[in-house]
Amino acid sequence: MIARDDVTGLILAGGRGSRMGGTDKGLQPLHGTPMAMHTMMRLTPQVGGLMINANRNLAAYESFGVPVYTDSVPDFAGPLAGMLAGLEQCATPWMVTAPCDSPFLPTDLVARLAQAIEAEGAELAIPVTLDPDGRRQTQPVFCLMPVSALDSLVAYLSGGGRKIETWAASHRLAEVLFDDAAAFANINTLDELRAHEAR
C-alpha cells in the first residue's frame, strides 16, 4: 500500500508563462491568493510533504514555507525538467506532480492514482478525462511516480526527449478515469484567470 507519508507532492512552477505574457503563472492571484498556493492547499492533505519547482521569483515561492528547487538542466526544458529536479530531491519513495495553475485539482487525486498503481502493478499513474465529445484526454503533468524512475528520466532527457506522455508510456502506466474534467483545468492566460475570478 502506498501511504500518504510515502508521497511527496511537487508543484511545477518552473515555466516561462509565455501564454500569460511572460508573467509567473503560479504567483498570479486568484481570489486574492496566488494560484500556486491554491494548488498547494489542495495537495497538502494528500501527501506527506511538499516542494516547489521554480526558476524565477524564488523568494516569493520560498515564502510559501516549503522547499523550492530549480531545474538542474538548463533553458526551461519543460515540465520534465521540473520532475527531474523533484526526483533528485525527493526523500520519499513516491512523488506526485501538479502544475502551479491547477487550483481545482481533485482532493482524491493521490489516493486514486495510488490505488491504480497497486491494482494494476503499474509503475506510474496519470489521470484521464473525457472532453465534451467523449474523447479521452490524458493529463500527464499530474503524475504519481516512484523515485526509482529517476534514471529513466535522466536517460530520456539526455536523449533530447521533452514529452511527458512519451516518457510515461515507456513504463507500466496506469490511466485513471476522473469524471470531473474541470478539476484539471489549467489557467493559461490572463483572460482565463479573469473568467475564473468572475465566477
Swiss-Prot record:
Binding partners and assembly: Monomer.
SUPFAM superfamilies listed in its UniProt record: Nucleotide-diphospho-sugar transferases (SSF53448)
Organism: Cupriavidus taiwanensis (strain DSM 17343 / BCRC 17206 / CCUG 44338 / CIP 107171 / LMG 19424 / R1)
Predominant location category: cytoplasm
UniProt-annotated binding residues for Mg(2+): D101
Residue ranges that the Swiss-Prot or TrEMBL entry lists as coiled coil: none
Protein's name according to its UniProt entry: Molybdenum cofactor guanylyltransferase
Gene name in the database record: mobA
Enzyme class: transferase
Keywords: Cytoplasm, GTP-binding, Magnesium, Metal-binding, Molybdenum cofactor biosynthesis, Nucleotide-binding, Transferase
Single Gene Ontology BP annotation: bis(molybdopterin guanine dinucleotide)molybdenum biosynthetic process
Reaction equation(s) it catalyzes: Mo-molybdopterin + GTP + H(+) = Mo-molybdopterin guanine dinucleotide + diphosphate
Record's function text: Transfers a GMP moiety from GTP to Mo-molybdopterin (Mo-MPT) cofactor (Moco or molybdenum cofactor) to form Mo-molybdopterin guanine dinucleotide (Mo-MGD) cofactor.
Cofactor(s) of this protein: Mg(2+)
Entry comment, domain topic: The N-terminal domain determines nucleotide recognition and specific binding, while the C-terminal domain determines the specific binding to the target protein.
GO molecular function, one term: molybdenum cofactor guanylyltransferase activity
HAMAP family in UniProt: MobA
GO cellular component, one term: cytoplasm
InterPro entries hit by this protein: MobA-like_NTP_Trfase (IPR025877), Molybde_CF_guanTrfase (IPR013482), Nucleotide-diphossugar_trans (IPR029044)
Pfam families: NTP_transf_3
Family membership: Belongs to the MobA family.
EC number from the UniProt entry: 2.7.7.77
Organism phylogeny: Bacteria, Pseudomonadati, Pseudomonadota, Betaproteobacteria, Burkholderiales
Residues annotated as binding GTP: L12, A13, G14, K25, N53, D71, D101
Subcellular location: Cytoplasm
